[in-house]
Amino acid sequence: AAPAEPTPTSTPAPGPVADDPSDPVRAAEYWLDGAGIREAWEVTRGKGATIAVIDTGIGTPPVIFDDAVAGGTDVSGNGTPDGRTPVGAVDRSHGTWVASLAAGRGNPDGTGMIGVAPEAKLLSISLGFGASAAVPFAEQVATAMRWAVDNGADVINLSFTTNTLDWDESWDDAFLYAYEHDVVVVVAAGNRGSGTSVIGAPATIPGVLTVG
């Protein structure tokens, strides 16, 4: 006898998000409506996905990351093993801000910073720029990419750029490794505000999703 056809099932829509648009912090997140994020929450809020943030590190104090960070590491040589101590004297909070935009939890009463995917998990991978690192930058990125893939990342976020179109040879294998494991790599087209006329690596690497 022919096998029975599977019975289709629907995924239940997630419950409502604790969301107070009158909160000054929440009201300042204009992209929640402008980019259709609140509408997207009716379908998914990132549950089951893991986002690796390769940046200066996700700080430990903000309550918006309670139960959000599933793991981490440091590739700079100057951070802590869990990747939760921001690295660098300048813009050390950059990684925390990036993570809050990605998967900040907000507060239970609907106030505070909330991310695009507030039910996703985060991996905090701290790297250093320039003198803030004891390891060459290209080596840090290659190591971080492989660690993220090996530790369950579904998405890798790189909110930084360089001033050259080309990239270190070690990045070829590292980015290919992510591609071969079906990991989406999201990269900033630029990170210098106005005046940037050239899109640099890693945004120029084939296969990445470049956002500008």
Ranges and model annotations:
Residues 1-4:
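Secretory targeting and sorting signals
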Residues 6-12:
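Extracellular mucin-like PTS domains
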Residues 13-15, 19-119:
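Active-site core segment of subtilase-fold serine proteases
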Residues 50-53, 155, 186, 210:
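Short glycine-aspartate micro-motif
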Residues 64, 207-210:
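Glycine-centered tight turns that cap/initiate beta-strands
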Residues 70, 76, 123, 184-186, ...:
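Structural detector of well-ordered beta-strand residues that form the stable sheet scaffold
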Residues 83-163, 212:
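Subtilisin-like peptidase catalytic core
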Residues 129-204:
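Substrate-binding/access-modulating region of protease and related hydrolase catalytic domains
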